[in-house]
From Swiss-Prot:
Its cofactor is Mn(2+). Binds 2 manganese ions per subunit. The gene is AMPP. One of its GO terms (cellular component) is cytoplasm. Its EC number is 3.4.11.9. This is Probable Xaa-Pro aminopeptidase P.
Length: 617
């Protein structure tokens, strides 16, 4: 997608800024729940900038506009931003962060405005300090200025019905989960926990929704105290069976009343403090470090609130046995769907000489997936990319402008689905012609990185920050690298990107150790801008493993892969693999055949393709 002319939108925004005496205005990507993926009505940064990537921040002054994003989106942003915008490449030397750039624009006593519901309390404090050093000030602007510019064209807020997530898939009742949470509150001597993250609420109550594309969540807040459980959600979203399910253990309150109730809790806490300067720990409410600045302010700020890494996000990331079994099962079905798609695609392109574009491919894959048991929908927008488009890390093919799939070029497909028993995310890079030596070399180096993570053995307490280099080492030896993390946590019929764990250089990945039951993606890559891109992705489960010595008398961990989709034999250069790596590939392909071949008893085309692609190397 090319640039959108943002001139009129920026002009109107600057008029509103001037009326409110705001000199610089920040437009984050997130919604009021700090969601990575958002509903169309919350796509404010995309509306004002024209940039459609999932990560980034827009900053507008009276004379300039800047968009900051990370390495996954540099190419995309360069194509989508019009001449009104400058691109701030996150992580580049001699390139200011968006916070630093904002502070520069605020020099000389200027006011920086932001909707306080769209940034966290800790972000607000840090940003305020940075801006004050330059002589400016940060101000919360309650009325969102982008919404005013957007006007009647802004999409309506979703009001989809909520559904039960059966215990056979959840593995644990919501009553048990709330009981566990209350034990954590007791340990911290807290008055309660105010929950704002949508996937945490869905997980806690074993409910699923459809308010955000690809993410089975719903708009809600919750407050859990030692004796009460309040769910803030619009009443029309709750079918009778859900109300009956929640029973008298959960009080349902209007979604919009959360801030009023938070203020009441704040006032109650202040009265209990008997005039002391700060409330005692037993009277403080916990909020996640990802809760909004506006929610923190409603609760009375730091004197009444303790910001913590959410105990729910930790519990949710450690899957129980029912969730793990679901992840294994859905990846077998999903692997079969991908195998059928790749066999079909090769036959159409090579044998039938059919002309297909990238969207034709992604549409066909969704149709094949939809036939499988427990399928609900996709877990993200499929990346179907040919040739140079594969070098755009988060490429999105648009029906009117996408490329024809070239059988003589690399084809990268990154896709996933939501099933009732789990969430999938798989990337495969294929070639239907004769790959170049560089393409084979790059693919094989990336494969070696994937195998290094898959076969890693490490002591309890090791973080994903430490493991990240395992995947990059083979590329590093050649002076190559990739500008994205190696892996992210994956939800169980929830968000495909799930914290707090992952493999990469983000600070948070150094704070949380890999734990048995974590489900993580393993997805190294390599990208040559304008030429081709390689990425291979499997989903892995952390587990305890036996070692010969067990140094330190502590558990040692490793991984189990659950993705069951063949690698591309044509792109593997066996001479670059060790004997151990060749054995891994052969063992993996043997397992893929064992788990998925039965799906193709009556499909000779796919069965033959699968047999060929899983032959020993």
């Amino acid at each position: 997608m090319g640039p959108v002319d943002t001139s009129q939108r920026l002009a109107r925004l600057r008029e509103l800024m001037q009326e409110r005496k705001v000199d610089v205005y920040i437009v984050p990507s997130e919604d009021s729940h700090q969601s990575e993926y958002i509903a169309p009505c919350d796509g404010r940064r995309e509306f004002i900038s024209g940039f459609t990537g999932s990560a980034g921040c827009a900053i507008v002054s009276m004379s300039k506009a800047a968009l900051s994003t990370d390495g996954r989106y540099f190419n995309q942003a360069a194509k989508q931003l019009d001449n009104n915008w400058m691109l701030l490449k996150r992580g580049f030397e001699n390139m200011p962060t968006w916070q630093e750039w904002t502070a520069e624009q605020a020099e000389g006593g200027k006011v920086v405005g932001v909707d306080p519901s769209l940034i966290t309390a800790s972000e607000a404090r840090s940003l305020s300090e940075t801006i004050e050093k330059s002589g400016g000030s940060l101000q919360g602007v309650q009325e969102n200025l982008i919404d005013l510019v957007w006007g009647k064209e802004r999409p309506a807020r979703p009001s989809e019905k909520v559904a039960l997530h059966p215990i056979e898939f959840a593995g644990k009742s919501f009553e048990e989960k709330i009981s566990d949470l209350r034990k954590e509150l007791q340990k911290k001597k807290s008055a309660g926990f105010v929950i704002s993250m949508l996937d945490e609420i869905a997980w806690l109550f074993n409910l699923r929704g459809n308010d955000i594309p690809y993410n089975p969540v719903f708009f809600a807040y919750a407050i859990i105290t030692p004796t009460t459980a309040d769910l803030y959600i619009d009443d029309e979203k709750l079918p009778a069976e859900v109300k009956k399910y929640l029973g008298d253990q959960v009080s349902v309150k209007p979604y919009g009343s959360i801030f009023e109730d938070a203020k009441a809790l704040s006032q109650s806490a202040q009265k209990k403090s008997d005039g002391d300067a700060s409330t005692s720990p037993s009277e403080k409410f916990l909020i996640s470090t990802k809760a909004s600045w506006s929610l923190s302010l409603a609760l009375g700020g730091e004197k009444n609130v303790e910001e913590v890494r959410s105990p729910i996000t930790d519990a949710k990331a450690i899957k129980n046995e029912a969730e793990l079994e679901g992840m294994r099962a859905c990846h077998i079905r999903d692997g079969a769907a991908l195998t059928e798609y790749f066999a079909w695609l090769e036959n159409e392109l090579v044998n039938k000489k059919t002309v297909l574009n990238e969207v034709d491919g992604s549409d066909k894959l969704e149709q094949i997936r939809s036939k499988h048991k427990h399928f609900v929908g996709l877990s993200f927008d499929t990346i179907s990319s040919t040739g140079p488009n594969a070098a755009v890390i988060h490429y999105k093919a648009e029906r009117d402008t996408c490329s024809i799939i070239d059988p003589k070029a690399v084809y990268l497909c990154d896709s996933g689905a939501q099933y009732l028993d789990g969430t999938t995310d798989t990337t495969r890079t294929l070639h239907f012609g004769e790959p170049t030596e560089m393409e084979r070399k790059a693919y094989t180096l990336v494969l070696k990185g994937l195998i290094s993570i898959d076969t890693a053995v490490f002591p309890k307490g090791t973080t994903g920050f430490a493991l990240d280099a395992f995947a990059r080492q083979h590329l590093w030896k050649e002076g190559l690298d990739y500008l994205h993390g190696t892996g992210h946590g994956v939800g169980s019929y929830l968000n495909v990107h799930e914290g707090p764990i992952g493999l990469g250089t983000r600070v948070q990945y150094a704070e949380v150790a890999i734990t048995p039951g974590n489900v993580i993606s393993d997805e190294p890559g390599f990208y040559e801008d304008g030429v081709f891109g390689i990425r291979i992705e499997n989903i892995i489960i952390a587990k305890e493993v036996k070692t010969t010595h067990g140094f330190g008398e502590k558990p040692w961990l490793g991984f189990e892969h659950v993705t069951m989709t063949p690698l591309c034999q044509k792109l593997i250069n066996p001479s670059l693999l060790t004997d151990g790596e060749k054995k891994w590939v052969n063992d993996y392909h043997s397992k893929v055949w064992e788990k998925t071949s039965s799906y193709f008893e009556n499909d000779e085309l796919t069965r033959n393709w699968l047999k060929r692609e899983t032959q020993p190397i």
